Amino acid sequence: MDLHETARYLLQYRTERHRICAITTYKGRITAVGLNSYVKTHPEQKRLAVRVGHAEREFLHAEISALLKAKKADAIHVFRLGKDGTWRNAKPCAICELAIKERY
């Protein structure tokens, strides 16, 4: 199963407004998967949100969820699935960019 197939499988039944999946890899193998959550948060999410001036964005982002789970990672891939089942543009927000820069 490639990364797109994995992301589609994980996102297909989600009902949130933004269906976003982040997958970390190390030497081409998946090391962690993160999905965005509007009901959960994490202290690291809050810390990063405050640092970039968006304290209100404390819900757990997919990228941060994946980075917290990954023991090793040399790449992170972000996917967004539209309500119609097509892939949409996805890129990390300022909060997640900071998390990625701190990690790498």
Placement of each model-derived feature along the sequence:
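Zinc-dependent deaminase catalytic domain
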Residues: 1-104
